[in-house]
Amino acid sequence: VKDMQVQRGAGTSTNGAGAFGASVNMQTEGASMKPYAEFNGSYGSFNTHKETVKVGTGLLNNHWTFDARLSNIGTDGYIDRASVDLNSYYLQGGYFAENTSVKLIAFAGKEKTYHAWGYATKKEMEDFGRRYNPCGEMYTDANGNKHFYDDQTDNYLQKNYQLLFNHTFSTAWNLNVALHYTKGDGYYEEYKDGRSLIEYGLKPFTIDGTEITKSDLVRQKKMDNKFGGGVFYINYTVNRLNASLGGGLNQYRGNNFGKVPWVKNYVGTLSPDHEYYRNKSQKTDGNIYLKANYDLTSGLSAYADLQYRHIDYTIDGNNDKYDWSKNALRPLAVDKKFDFFNPKVGLNWNITSNHRVYASFSVAQKEPTRNNYTDGDPDSYPKAEKLLDYEAGYTFANQWLTAGANFYYMDYTDQLVLTGALNDIGEALTENVPDSYRMGIEIMLGIKPCKWFQNRPTLVR
């Protein structure tokens, strides 16, 4: 990542179709015009280390560049057994002409992380130390020593491909098109003790005349997902007008399923690929927007951003949660369509070279996430959220001082808020609240008394 920007409020259409609240815009590394080779390494506590190798050809034949990077990050972890092993690569090839550029990018990452989401209690930390990790605990032997499951890990591999096209038609017109595809495969594995066999589609078995309905077992929750699509925008700039027409069409397809590779003392035939739940998802997301900034007079400008977005979202199959009232896995039958119109307008007035005031109004709407559906009540699926964002502010800037205040009022309908509950891997659960709001003031101050020192504190109330 070359650059990362965080924008408060309702994000602009350029930064993503689903911008709701603050948005993050990340820019990948640009091509280097000069050849280079670089190695970076670091080492710290708990065997924490990072190694990166970067090489690049520079500009070849006045048109071509190629860049590559390999990296590894690892640690034993402060928490017991909370080890991490991360590996990634980045490849980039580019063609550059006077008015056109084409870049092909491929990058991937692989991770293996031992679970540390079990949240040790205060009593456990008093008994076993602050670094105690209950995840993967199997049993305590006769000497009082706890034994843990070695493969209590999260494993994921993701591959990404991007094709970026840029063309400048004239001083007024330019076009950007990006195609992308992502393939992900992963699973997490965990040891579970005393689990009911029926939850996993397994029949009770008999040992020495005793029927066994619960047993220790190992389960894997897996995912296989694909995400692809394209985005574009065409920009027009002339005199006092800067306008863009853009949009995108993307589709996500995913399979989530669970397997039980081992059951303690199991009597009977247990397939190594015994599957106990499966569901598939498909989400098609299309959007189009028109945005413009116009200089009304010297120092005074107005902007508008009008976006329409449509989503088709389906999830079909069984959840991984067992419904004891019905003696069956919870079904998933989501078939939702969303249509959102998200307008944004604003004014900016540079009173002088030092003083600036601004005001804006934005609408942002967002569909529930997959977790909102799978962790929620199957008889009452969550609703889409809507935000009306009102903001106004003032900034002052000169050579050594910047200061400003931003007032905001955010009016929500059906906001998904934290309930305080957690799901089985420690993620926070949410539910819709019919009406809610946030309001406050952000005070910013920047001091730069000399070239080599600056300080930028921020106060939010």
Give short role names for the model-derived ranges.
Residues S298, Y409-D411, E431-R461:
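Gram-negative outer-membrane beta-barrel transporters
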Residues S42-K50, S71-F96, G136-N166, S215-G229, ...:
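Outer-membrane beta-barrel proteins
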Residues V1-E38:
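A beta-strand signature from Gram-negative outer-membrane beta-barrel systems
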Residues G41-N47, L59, N72-D76, A97-N99, ...:
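Transmembrane beta-strands of outer-membrane beta-barrel pores
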